[in-house]
């Protein structure tokens, strides 16, 4: 009877434990603090929203030091799926005298307060006599407990292996390349030296670095932005992502240990930087505008295209979801290439597109349907959102073009003239959705035949009706035709002038073809 009672009590404990797991609190926000905020160029403190896969748990963490009785916080923020944090409502460090104290917990803002309660060995009292156990019970106990312990260890080890494998792919540098150049060796075998910071963005900073005898770009993500780093790595690793108008991917790495882990993404380096930086410092001629716009449209059209039967597999259609001039880089010959795939979505037949939160991207470039939160979560809807943003980038190019007779404006971001440099979501909704305004297309642009056609193309890209927008492939073809037409018009003007001066009749251009 005693053994049966113990067995029933054990089952009751397991049931209670399962109920506690099912009733766990979800972590949505954590207290954020970074003691090295000046060095890392981040905010010092605040509230950090936690993001992650739906099937993984999110936690808060805190790290601190005890220096002569004075508590110094090192970092606080969101923590990724960690079994050691499961079902902990309070942030408590239990290790005995660690050099750096660490605790994690589950629940909103649960890291606001943190504690140190070292585990103490409890001495069992010996005054009470021990009730002798029946021989059969002892035999079962000594036989089953080791077996169950080994089984638990094996299962836990397998779970940890799977968890680690999914979180950090074991081989992060591509070992196969569908064409030239030949595949690079593992990044770990090459010396990589960071030289200078070139840009900062929502998910990290970009460094110019030296890899052997060539310059590369290194985008460094903090561990909190692992999801963006992993998404960008996965997009670059898809079949068919080697393209002249998509930023060349070199490799990815995890650097550092423990809580000071940084995630690196290594790509080709382009000295001219982003289209934003280039337009701030330079004006463009009509031919330069056409070349930049055409290669940008070609890159986006390739990204949007579903291409089966490639040598290295099936390339799915991909929506960028953060098209803007900052994410268009320029090579030395002004060829555009599209970068930054941290928010990109791939569309594979029979598979979910993954994380499809509606309002993502840069507010200034958000399409009306995104600002309204009225997105149709289908592939074509996401591709049309990219095309709206592309219309704004084409406007930026037009605003700095010297083709028209009028003055060239100082560089401004889309809607900067209407609502300034730091618009809120409400500002964008009011201007774009309710008033249906768009950046101004100058009257003087209409006097140039090519610019007039470009203005028409821009208006069809940012149309309020998403289904009426042009595709990226159509924009590419239009720009090619625009450039050809303006070259013909220019040539005919020259022929007319020469005829008037020399009084020599030239055959019409059609007869010379």
Curated annotation (Swiss-Prot):
Glycosylation sites: 43, 66
Annotated catalytic residues: 322
Gene3D superfamilies: CD59, Phosphorylase Kinase, domain 1, Transferase(Phosphotransferase) domain 1
Covalent S-S links between cysteines: 30-60, 50-78, 85-104, 91-103, 105-110
CDD domains referenced in this protein's UniProt entry, alphabetically: STKc_ACVR2a, TFP_LU_ECD_ACVR2A
Cofactor: Mg(2+); Mn(2+)
Topological domain spans for side Cytoplasmic: 161-513
Compartments where located: Cell membrane
Domain Protein kinase: start-end pairs: 192-485
Tissues showing expression: Expressed in hen anterior pituitary during the ovulatory cycle and in the ovarian follicle.
Biological-process GO terms, alphabetical: activin receptor signaling pathway; axis specification; cell population proliferation; cellular response to growth factor stimulus; mesodermal cell differentiation; pattern specification process
Extracellular side: 20-139
Statement: the UniProt record of this protein carries the keyword Disulfide bond: yes
Protein name: Activin receptor type-2A
Organism: Gallus gallus (Chicken)
């Amino acid at each position: 009877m005693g053994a049966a009672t113990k067995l029933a009590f054990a089952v009751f404990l397991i049931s209670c434990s399962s109920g506690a797991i099912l009733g766990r609190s979800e972590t949505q926000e954590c207290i954020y603090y970074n003691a090295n905020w000046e060095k890392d160029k981040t905010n010092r403190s605040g509230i950090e929203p936690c993001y992650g896969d739906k099937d993984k748990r999110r936690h808060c963490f805190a790290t601190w030091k005890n220096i002569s009785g004075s508590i110094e916080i090192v970092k606080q923020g969101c923590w990724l799926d960690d079994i050691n944090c499961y079902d902990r409502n309070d942030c408590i460090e239990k290790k005995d005298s660690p050099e750096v104290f660490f605790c994690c917990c589950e629940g909103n803002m649960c890291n606001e307060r943190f504690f140190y309660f070292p585990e103490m060995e409890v001495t069992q009292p010996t005054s009470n006599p021990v009730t002798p156990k029946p021989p059969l019970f002892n035999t079962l106990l000594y036989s089953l407990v080791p077996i169950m312990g080994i089984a638990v260890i094996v299962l836990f080890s397998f779970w940890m292996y799977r968890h680690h494998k999914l979180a950090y792919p074991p081989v992060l540098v591509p070992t196969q390349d569908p064409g030239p150049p030949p595949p690079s060796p593992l990044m770990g075998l090459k010396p990589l030296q960071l030289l200078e910071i070139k840009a900062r963005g929502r998910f990290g900073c970009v460094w110019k670095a030296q890899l052997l005898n060539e310059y590369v770009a290194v985008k460094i993500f903090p561990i909190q932005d692992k999801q963006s780093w992993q998404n960008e790595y996965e997009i670059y690793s898809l079949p068919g992502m080697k393209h002249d108008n998509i930023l060349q991917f070199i490799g990815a790495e995890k650097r550092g240990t423990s809580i000071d882990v940084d995630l690196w993404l290594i790509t080709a380096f382009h000295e001219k930087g982003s289209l934003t930086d280039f337009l701030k410092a330079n004006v463009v001629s009509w031919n330069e505008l056409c070349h930049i716009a055409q290669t940008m449209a070609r890159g986006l059209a390739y990204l949007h295209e579903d291409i089966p039967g490639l040598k290295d597999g099936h390339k799915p259609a991909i929506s960028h979801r953060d098209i803007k001039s900052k994410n268009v880089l320029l090579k030395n010959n002004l060829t555009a290439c599209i970068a930054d795939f941290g928010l990109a979505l791939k569309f594979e037949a029979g598979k979910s597109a993954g994380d499809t939160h509606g309002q993502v991207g840069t507010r200034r470039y958000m399409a009306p349907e995104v600002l309204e939160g009225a997105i149709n979560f289908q592939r074509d809807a996401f591709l049309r959102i990219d095309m709206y943003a592309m219309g704004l980038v084409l406007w930026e190019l037009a605003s700095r073009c010297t083709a028209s007779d009028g003055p060239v404006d100082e560089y401004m971001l889309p809607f900067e003239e209407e609502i300034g440099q730091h618009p809120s979501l409400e500002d964008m909704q009011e201007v774009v959705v309710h008033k249906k305004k768009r950046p101004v297309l100058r009257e003087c642009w209409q006097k140039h035949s090519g610019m007039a056609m470009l203005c028409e193309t821009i208006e069809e890209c940012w149309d309020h009706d998403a289904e009426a927008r042009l595709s990226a492939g159509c924009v590419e073809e239009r720009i090619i035709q625009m450039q050809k037409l303006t070259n013909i018009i220019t040539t005919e003007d020259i022929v007319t002038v020469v005829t008037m001066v020399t009084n020599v009749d030239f055959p019409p251009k059609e007869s010379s073809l």
